[in-house]
């Protein structure tokens, strides 16, 4: 024992635990005693390896000088998490070298820049060559330091704040945005039905496909659909190529797309577009899709269209319904909702949808540039070439100035607006658009439109209030879409005159809320108008929820307005049906129709991936009783639905399926429907491993999985559930952080060790293999993975994971400054296959 100081050991860990693998090591009674001690030291913490006592007095010891000082460990590559000033910034393998008895990380200026260090401010760093490594960070950045916590595999870097880049909260360096791997995918959503009415039978189906292919920063996308109703109709709605332009925080699109809908009404066109992408900003505002609420009087089919294209189709039961999973294809453009009842009657209404320009901070700007040929789903509509540009700029005193122009051969429009935040009073914006229109018959129209927008959230009262009003001051104002529909002098277009929207949401505590929304659209040259009103109150108490609603719909193509009321009640059950509820609902309308429904729905007991619903109801006006039953499976490879509906007018069988098929460099993987950016988990050989925070997502038989949604330009952590791993599976890192670029398919690659967990007892001619010797599995020539490795403990014992049924274990150590080595050919007996940890003893020669 060194006489300069008393024995003091701390921060030692995994002396006999493999560098990679799971589970603990062999027992080290004497060593563990020292590891748990703490005493005052009068000099550097130091431990003399010669002080170790072994159960076998004849036990020899390898050179353990790496462990002589507190925190000492063997040099090598370790999978670690990197923390800068107590914030995690990265994770991955780092090479550690022995520097005066302490493990120090090998760093580069590029790595420090990735961690947020202002590298350009230090000449000592800028003089380094690309890839040149260094270990002592304090020699390059004054007052900086590094500390490796071996027990938690955490590298802590302390860097003065003045040496860090000053960035907004949530900022992620664009250099870390991952363009992803080459991939191609198909996102599918299929619904269908077979209906029998009296003597007739009909079938219908709808297939929506969202296809994509990625190569580098480029993304190819396509949206197609197929409808069958007596005959097939296939339609490719849009195809485009896109990539992000990091230098200007923008998105470039080439092909079929939509113009920005913040200043002018959004229109579809084929051409080129460059527009600011706020998702690249630290405090970005995310887009939204409206919730569509309506009423069905029977088992009905609901179809949602935008710009003339069907974007959503589903089947609903009698009563009030809400659609909240839309994927709109444009930034604005009212949604046309069609409800087809079981008796064949059809009702339609308009759901307003537009993005409201939000206020910009002082000095910030955003823009949109579009050029191409206008495209419409309607026939006999002109398709002129045009250009459009819009610009927003944040001024002092919470003002935002914005404007834009649309230019075509027979149409010119200019817009100018200003918005301002008024603190507690909310935000108000107003703009004026002037337009000149020429028709093919050489008629000319000039008009203007005034728009006012207001939005306010009253946090103290839980009220959210927004209002948007469009006023067309003359009958000679035409929007771009309306102007292109003016085909001849004899045709008179009922262009829009005045439009109002209002939406108010009021919460009462944490369990009740009131929602009010209204929309009105009037037209020139017509007495008809479109109006929609919805009032709803919803509440809950001890798990019991209820709500009442009022719906009013007036369409310009219908003479009579529809008025309806609804009430619903849901009561959760207990016992073996603790994941189920009983529901009751009733509806009535101004046409004398009324209905009542009783339902039982929830998760099938013992099956978290399978939901069911049973309904029984009765309606007047000759419709009689109705009933339905449905199953909804939502698994790791997609979802499937099957339902049966019956009423006095028809019997209907419905079905559906949704999911994704992804082709990537490592094969083909099935998954749930994917978003624009998603991840491929690669854990070779680790079958049926669950992904944390992923609903029913798990790896397939090859160890691959699709994580269906990621937040672009943000840190996303993908974590494997180690509790779901089999006994022969280990991973180096349980979680990984990915930062996908827009539309990227990123790879979360896990280093797996598939094989046995083995406790070896190693002997040589002199007895047990020395304590502290290194052990490593000899790999085959075609094996490119990391070989399992570890260290010998007391009694020649070494624990390793990922070990094959047979192989060669290589052992090396330093004794009296002489390098020594031996190898053990081993075979695990078949009778040990049921053991979680196998044991192998043998002579190392």
Regions of interest found by a model, annotated:
Residues 177, 203-216, 235-248, 383-397, ...:
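Feature captures outer-membrane beta-barrel proteins of Gram-negative bacteria and organelles
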